């Protein structure tokens, strides 16, 4: 009967991730996030991947947007953090976004998208917007 059936969660929340300064803002960091997304959508079959952060954390917000997470809103006074009310910004990628986003990551990670100094030719955002 439905009342005794347990349904697995179809959402995965990206908890805290901390890259060392050596890895920050490198193609390897972007590839690591891409590999996590492959696992979430292709490997585990989730429908939704969430990114939540302090609404004052501009670096986290910028990273979420660059990686293709879409802003969904602010949970006002979601938590108390370091003695202050913390508003939480919510972002997500859903399964219908995944095929185009996956193609954008694959195009961005292609060695032909990097010059001889290892600098990107097109940004991930530019590739996503040109699809």
Describe the role of every protein-language-model region:
Residues 1-12:
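Short, small-residue-biased leader/transition segments that mark boundaries at the very start
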Residues 16-27:
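A short, internal acetyl-CoA/4′-phosphopantetheine-binding micro-motif in the GNAT/acyltransferase core
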Residues 24, 37-41:
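A conserved short alpha-helix in the GNAT/GCN5 acetyltransferase fold that borders
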Residues 42-52:
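Conserved GNAT acetyl-CoA-binding A-motif
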Residues 51-60:
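Conserved beta-strand-loop-alpha-helix junction that forms the acyl-donor binding cleft
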Residues 64, 91:
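Conserved active-site tyrosine of GNAT-family acetyltransferases
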Residues 70-84:
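Conserved catalytic-core motifs of GNAT/GCN5-like acyltransferases
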Residues 99-131:
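Acidic/histidine-enriched, glycine/proline-rich intrinsically disordered or flexible terminal extensions
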